[in-house]
A protein has these predicted regions:
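Non-heme Fe(II) oxygenase catalytic core, chiefly the N-lobe of the double-stranded beta-helix
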Residues: 1-171
């Protein structure tokens, strides 16, 4: 209850679109769990932007850990996408400013999410959306992309795999 009250200080709460919430009383709380039987990358293991595959992704998400694995097993890291944009070459900035990313809930990061969906998910089809890769927020530009969900670019470009690799390495 306190967690929900705290979260409401930042804005309207949203439900995670792929999994059922904790219970009927707290549908906005999603249990993020790694099981011994899971294969592939852990739920959210790679750098990503939460729910980027929705038309209007949440402005923020919060984590509260009940069980913390040993160091190196579940580290949460943060990075500034403002600085990431500033550090791009001029030619890369121009290229990315002209593109939108196509994002999918079935992207490469979705292995464990698919396992959770089978267990206690919502029956929904693939979610896809398109967003500018570079966003202007206030007076600053920032990279807005998610390696685990990016499946293409608009307009389509040659060597998109190379561009994805460069972008993700930079982020």
């Amino acid at each position: 209850k306190l967690y929900i009250q705290f979260a409401k200080n930042f804005g309207k709460l949203a439900n995670y679109p792929r999994l059922k919430g904790l219970n009927k009383k707290y549908p906005q709380i999603t249990v993020v769990q790694r099981k011994e039987s899971d294969k592939g990358p852990s739920f959210g293991e790679q750098f990503h932007t939460d729910s980027i595959y929705t038309k209007k992704p949440p402005r923020f998400t919060m984590l509260l850990s009940k069980l913390v694995p040993k160091k190196g097993k579940a580290n949460t890291e943060f990075c500034s996408q403002y600085y990431a944009f500033k550090d791009l070459t001029k030619s890369m900035k121009r290229k990315l400013l002209s593109l939108k990313g196509v994002y999918s809930s079935e992207g490469p990061i979705s292995v464990t999410t698919k396992e959770r969906v089978k267990e206690k998910g919502k029956k929904i089809k693939e979610l896809k959306s398109t967003h500018k890769i570079i966003r202007k927020i206030s007076s600053n530009y920032a990279i807005y992309s998610s390696p685990g969900h990016l499946v293409g670019f608009q307009p389509k470009i040659k060597n998109s795999i190379d561009l994805k690799k460069k972008l993700f390495k930079h982020q």
